Amino acid sequence: MKLVELVACYKALGEAKVTKLEESEVIKIVKARKAMRPFAEEYDAFLKDVQEKFKPENFDEIQSNVQKWKDLSDEEKIATNKALAEYQKKVNDAVEAELNKVVEVSVEKLNENSATKILLENGWELKKLDEIEVIL
């Protein structure tokens, strides 16, 4: 699976309520998260490094401008938006290759009933199942 899929699944499973699942299914989720954790944590550390290294010198000023957005002139808003967009593009470009890496993780699949129960218990839309597809 691609790292981007793993990270999304890891986060979704971490946020998911699973009180209505059978005990054996909850154990599958816990074991899946355990197998995914090293990859997800390594990516989070990588992302933080990238975000830190690409911060422009005036990043604190940019963040301050965001906080006082209503008080900014149109020119200041444009400049702030431009600076944030440039920063975000650099970060996105830097992490894209990392997210597209294929990682090998073995996880036990949940049964179909568990997918339905997770969906209903968490009030998720059907498309949320795409994020946890790797264990379905």
What is each model feature region?
Residues 1-136:
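A composition-driven surface/loop motif
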